[in-house]
Amino acid sequence: MDRSNWAAFAAADPGLAATVEKRFGAFTHHVLATLRKDGSPRTTGLEVRFLHGELWLGMMPNSVKALDLRRDPRFALQANPGPGTDMADGDVRIGGRAIEVDDDAEAVRRYVDEVNPPDPSAFHLFRTELTEVVRTYVEDDAYLVVQVWKPGEPVRTVRRT
């Protein structure tokens, strides 16, 4: 697997990256899926940030989602669909690995300066390595369109009737 951060994805497909970032920017809270100790899935709410070419996941100290990611870094992140059934710009989700940032004081400082967490001295910060980005939307009221990006591959688009 190629290591791929947000900047690498945005360089590979700027249009899809802008749409995905817009969807995540439409609402504050999104859904993060992690794996529990026994391997079963856990879903929790989360705020995300796109800063300095990275997708960041910040968490309260010793939150169960942070402990899950320390044990198994795989995650899935689903954008908040918002109210109703409109879902302008479609449904988007991101899969990847979350890498805790505990040895890069400059990255933590820049995140704190931008985000201003409640306690800047006590939180978990993870950068992400993307394994896939998926957008699903309806086109012309006729097609369900699924766009899938994976590192090192072009975007694959499937239209279903």
Q: Which residues are covered by each model-predicted region?
A:
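Charged, gly/pro-rich active-site loop segments
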Residues: 1-15, 86-161
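Short, conserved active-site entrance elements at the starts or edges of catalytic domains
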Residues: 7-36
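A generic structural signal for nonpolar/aromatic side chains embedded in well-ordered alpha-helices
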Residues: 24, 69, 110-112
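Short beta-strand segments
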Residues: 27-61, 69, 77-81, 90
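ATP/adenylate-binding site constellation spanning eukaryotic-like Ser/Thr protein kinases
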Residues: 29, 74, 130
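Short acidic (Asp/Glu) patches
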Residues: 62, 73-81, 106-117
